[in-house]
Every structure is written in C-alpha cells, then in structure tokens.
Curated annotation (Swiss-Prot):
This is Phosphoenolpyruvate carboxykinase (ATP). Transmembrane segments: none annotated. Its EC number is 4.1.1.49. It is found in: Cytoplasm. Belongs to the phosphoenolpyruvate carboxykinase (ATP) family. Its main location: cytoplasm. GO terms for biological process: gluconeogenesis. It holds the Pfam family PEPCK_ATP. Involved in the gluconeogenesis. Catalyzes the conversion of oxaloacetate (OAA) to phosphoenolpyruvate (PEP) through direct phosphoryl transfer between the nucleoside triphosphate and OAA. GO terms for cellular component: cytosol.
Length: 511
C-alpha cells in the first residue's frame, strides 16, 4: 500500500529522507545528498512540447528542443502510473512572489529530499493560490528510467515542459537544479506577455529602498556581490521586473559550495543549517563535517536553503524598480575596463551578448586555453522566446524608470590570464559601492573608441590608473592586438541577432 504525503514540514521531510536512506545529516544540521551520474543540468535532455498555442513564439534550436505532444502524454501517463505505486510527496507552492504574477504549482516527487528542495527553492505561501489561478503540475520521478526508443527521449532521463497543459515532467533526474530551472523557463516564457521582464540576476536593496540588479554568468560574482552586509537581499538568481516592481521568482537560494568558507562567504555559510540541503559534497564518515574543498564528486557542489535562512533579507521578497543595473563579466583577456557606463542601446547590446571568458581547460594553464563565452541575456539555456523579445523589454523598462546601467569586469587587468592580475575583491566592491551610492550617475568619462565604451575618469576608492585598461598593460600595442581579437568575437557573435541598427552601433567596432 503506497502513501501520499501532503505538504509536510521541513522536519518531517528531513526525517523521512533519512529513514529512506536518501541522504545523511551533516554536523551543521543540513541534509547531504548525492545525485549520481548527473551533477549538473543536462541540456540535451530538456525539451518543450511542440503544440499550436506556443509553437510560433518559441525560439526552437539546440536549447529549446521540440517534443511530440502525443509522446509526452504517453510518457506522463507512464510516469504517473509508476509513481502511483510508490510513496510520494506532494507540496503546493508558488513560483513568483508578486501577487499578480505568481504561478500556483502542485509538486509531486518520488523522493522526500527533492520535495524539500522544491519547498526551499520555490515559495511556501501563507495561503495557496488566493487568486484562484490555473494550476501548474510538476511530476518528478527521480528513479524512473526512460527508454529513448519507446519514450522519444534522448537518454534515460528527461525534463519536458508542456505549456498547453501546464505540466512539467522530470524523469530519471536526481540533480534537483533541473526542477528549479524548468520553472524559471516557464516564467521566462509567460512573463513577457504581461509586460514583465524575467531576468537571470541577483537583486538587493539599500536601507533607503534603492534596488540594484546584478546580471552575470556563473563565476562572475552574482551571488557573492549581492550578499552585502550593508544591504537587504531580495534574491540570488531569478527575478521579474514589471511596472513598479522587482520581485523574486523564488523563495530560496541555490549557491555553489566549492571552496566555501566562513571567512569568505559568511552569509551562505550561516544559511547552511537544519532544513538546508547540501548536494554532492563529501562529509567525514565520523564527524559528519562537510568538506567543501573536496571536488571528487563534482566542482558543481551546491546548497539549497530557504530565504528565511538569510537574516538581512527583504521579507516581502520584492521591492521597487532598479535605480542601478550591473552586468558582471569575468574578462580573462584583460581587455575590458573595470567599469563602463552604458547607454540604453549599449545595455541592450551587452545584455544580448552576455559575455564572459572562461579558462577552456580544467587545468588552469596557459592563456591560449582562454575561451570567450557568450550566453544571451546572461542565461541562454533558460529563455524560450527569441532574444530580441527580452532586449526590447529591457530597453522599455530602462526608459520608463530611468535606471542607470553599468558593465563591471571582475576579471583580469594588465594582461590576459596568466600574465596580468585579477581585480581584487575590495576594488570590485568599491566600484559596486560607488555605483549604488550614485557616485557614477553623472561623472566625467573617457570614450574608448574600439570597445565603444564610456569609462569614468574617477571612481571613489579605486586607483585611477586601473580605469583605462590600455594603460595597465606593459605594451599598448600588445593590448590593442588582444582588444581586436576580443572585438572580433563580439562582432561575430552578434551577427545572429536581428535587432535595431542603433543596438548594433552601440557595440564594439572591429578594425
């Protein structure tokens, strides 16, 4: 006889997860789990059902892969029959903290720990679905094995979104981040219809109520820089921006744990306690101490905790429109300035480009291994509509509110990776503080022609010699050569966008 457990408390879910051998309790009180062969998202296993009501609005391709509607129905029924014979966990949550723009979701999971994950990352409302909206369903059977020949999937696991039926199916997926990002993709499709820009960004607010957004790909400092002891956190990853509001799409944080320390990340460290989940981290068999430096399972170790675990947060989970918007890039070529001031068109250009640079090899070796990465809207895997839809909405929001936009390089200066040096965290924090304090809203600038960027001539607390990157290199000619290489990559990447000429003109210039 199988049981359905409805809307269990955190303590009960932890208790059942331990009783069912789904994880272990760490010395800090968190539940430690492993996710098997998948320790990150599986883009090749993510699909959107192709059906008439949404087919013309989705940007189909290697990211948004089509799935047959009849095959979806058959697989959903198969997974539902499978999970009906097991103990299962059901929770009722919201995705989106705005009273107008939330989605009510019935989440059914095969494991207790993934239900706890959903309750940590989504929003646990005081009353479920007060506006009586149409309900979405998540069906998550982690131990179900798909058969590609029978099910039409790519492998033994899948994530499939069906907009027409308001269903999200996860089968064979132990990595819980898939569930969070699937619902982000759902909101990223739906919100633009309501004049709301969905954003892959973190957000915080000053004590006087001024909101700041941080966009950036993994490793650029989004989570670290938004966790500011002098400001209140709204959220660390997913937000919507509509007329009069910035709201969190989530109710929790999903932070990277690699090399986590109390000294460097006190807010995250303190949030990992009873009720939090730690994913793919080794723990000592005797003391049960987590070892965040051990990457034998993955470098993508994570912790999932509710926002209640962050002391200095915005209780309502939303705030006013942003005074300041920061695009973070970790430029390992050393070409970009530490801070640039962007016009609305330049903001659209860099938003569409979504540039950062990674070391291509896992061995942090020579600078020849550098790889420039362009991820549209600073989160290409999660945006189902054509990119221009989001860029136009960004410019509209900036125009209507008058937000100031900045490009901040948290990467290298004085030369590429291996030759130059990384901007220190105090330097980056001084730049962020100057932006948030309004010190750069109206300042004298220098125009860098090739990059087509405006750089402030003075930033409080920052060495003026760092502001123009060309002057920090030993050889200006060497810098110019590297700059042209990077500019050529920007230009080549931007050819895929069909946007207004004014946006193209706001980008770097080859030659």
């Amino acid at each position: 006889m199988s049981n359905t457990y409805n809307d269990l408390s955190t303590a009960r879910l932890v208790e059942l997860a331990l009783a069912r051998n789904e994880g272990q309790l760490a010395s800090n009180g968190s539940l430690v789990v492993t996710t098997g062969e998948r320790t990150g998202r599986s883009p090749m296993d993510r699909f959107i059902v192709e059906e008439p009501s949404t087919a013309d609005d989705i940007h189909w391709g290697p990211i948004n892969r089509p799935f047959d509607a009849e095959k979806f129905d058959a697989l959903w029924d198969r997974v539902e029959a499978y999970i009906a014979e097991k103990d299962r966990f059901v929770s009722h949550v919201h995705v989106g903290s705005d009273p107008e723009h939330y989605l009510p979701v019935k989440m059914t999971t095969e494991t207790a720990w993934q239900n706890l994950f959903g309750r940590n990352l989504f929003i646990r409302p005081d009353s479920f679905n007060p506006a009586d909206k149409q309900e979405w369903q998540i069906l998550n059977a982690a131990n179900f094995e798909c058969v590609p020949e029978r099910d039409g999937t790519n492998s033994n696991g899948c994530v499939i979104i069906n907009f027409a039926k308001r269903k999200v199916l996860l089968a064979g997926m132990h990595y819980a981040g898939e569930m969070k990002k699937a619902m982000f993709s759902v909101q990223n499709f739906l919100l633009p219809e309501k004049d709301v820009l969905p954003m892959h960004c973190s957000a915080n607010v000053s004590e006087t109520g001024e909101t700041c957004l941080f966009f950036g790909l993994s490793g650029t400092g989004k989570t670290t820089l938004s966790a500011d002891p002098h400001r209140f956190l709204i959220g660390d990853d997913e937000h919507g921006w509509g007329p009069g509001t910035v709201f969190n799409i989530e109710g929790g944080c999903y932070a990277k744990c690699i090399d986590l320390s109390q000294k460097n990340e006190p807010i995250i460290w303190d949030a990992i306690r009873f009720g939090a989940i730690v994913e793919n981290v080794m723990i000592d068999p005797e003391t049960r101490e987590p070892d965040y430096n051990d990457v034998s399972l993955t470098e993508n170790s994570r912790c999932a905790y509710p926002l209640e675990h962050v002391e200095k947060r915005v209780i309502e989970n939303r705030a006013g429109e942003p005074s300041h918007i920061i695009f973070l890039t970790c430029d390992m070529t050393g070409v970009l300035p530490p801070v640039s001031i962007l016009s609305r068109e330049a903001a659209a250009y860099h938003f569409l480009s979504g540039y950062t640079a990674l070391v291509g090899s896992t061995e942090m070796g020579s600078s020849s291994k550098l790889k420039s990465t362009f991820s549209t809207c600073f989160g290409a895997p999660f945006f189902p509509r054509p990119a221009g839809v989001y860029a136009e909405l960004l410019m509209k929001r900036i125009d209507e509110f008058g937000s100031k936009v900045f490009l901040v390089n948290t990467g290298w200066t004085g030369g590429p990776y291996g030759e130059g040096k990384r901007f220190s965290i105090p330097t980056t924090r001084a730049i962020i503080a100057a932006i948030q304090n309004g010190d750069l809203d109206d300042v004298e600038t220098e125009h860098l022609d090739a990059l087509n960027l405006d750089v402030p001539k003075h930033v409080p607390g920052v060495d003026t010699e760092l502001l123009n990157p060309r002057t920090t290199w030993v050889s200006p000619d060497y810098y110019d050569g590297k700059a042209q290489e990077l500019i050529a990559q920007f230009v080549e990447n931007f050819k895929k966008f069909d946007v207004a000429d004014a946006i193209v003109e706001a980008g770097p210039k080859a030659g």
